[in-house]
Amino acid sequence: MTLQQQRTQEALRALPSAGWVGRRDRAVHVLSQMAGMSDEQIATLTVGDVVIADGAATITAPTGTITLAASIDTLICGPCALARWLHVLDMIVIYPDRYVIDAVVARAAPLSTNSPHLCRGACASTDATRQMPLLPPIDRWGLISAITAQRGHRDSRQPYALRHGGTARAHRPPDTRELLAH
């Protein structure tokens, strides 16, 4: 094992596995360190570019196809980290209510070395999910915009409102009455 591989494994063990932020961070680390992708390459990926099946992750990048094999330890398994992030993205499209996603992710058991591998079977996602960016923008309240998720990958250099004639709806956090109603 090289020093780079050892450091990558140590970082994956140290990264939080709980919550959708932890899942996103682990997925980014896998793509940058295990797959050796640059920030620019990662930014262009869509969910459809990542296929998880039979203990491997196949990433179709502009530079070619990258295959990551599963690890015995779930904490350092790159395909499992990607599968967990893809599951969150699929929930964003299926359940537009943020509270549903938060409840499902919060109830998930924390990762351990004996956690089940999610990469062993096929990781299915909807057609709408496959079109969205693998790392969609997050608004100032920490939410992934449903508009972005449903519209798919766009050129991030041009603001959404400019691409759509200034008709973009702004996301707002729920007010106190909405929070107390749940």
State what each model feature region is.
Residues 1-14, 139-143:
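Flexible interdomain linker/hinge and immediately adjacent N-terminus
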Residues 7-39:
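Basic, Lys/Arg- and aromatic-enriched nucleic-acid-binding interface segment
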Residues 17-21, 31, 74, 127, ...:
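Residue-level marker of regulatory loop/turn positions in helix-turn-helix DNA-binding domains and
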Residues 18, 154-182:
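Short, basic (Lys/Arg/His-rich) helix/loop patches that form interaction surfaces
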Residues 24, 38, 66-68, 89, ...:
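Short, cationic motifs built from Arg/Lys/His that form the positively charged side of catalytic pockets
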Residues 29-71:
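Internal, hydrophobic cores of structured domains that mediate oligomerization or house catalytic pockets
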Residues 30-31, 84, 181:
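Short, hydrophobic/amphipathic alpha-helical patches that form generic packing surfaces
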Residues 58-159:
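Basic, alpha-helical nucleic-acid-contacting "clamp/cap" segments
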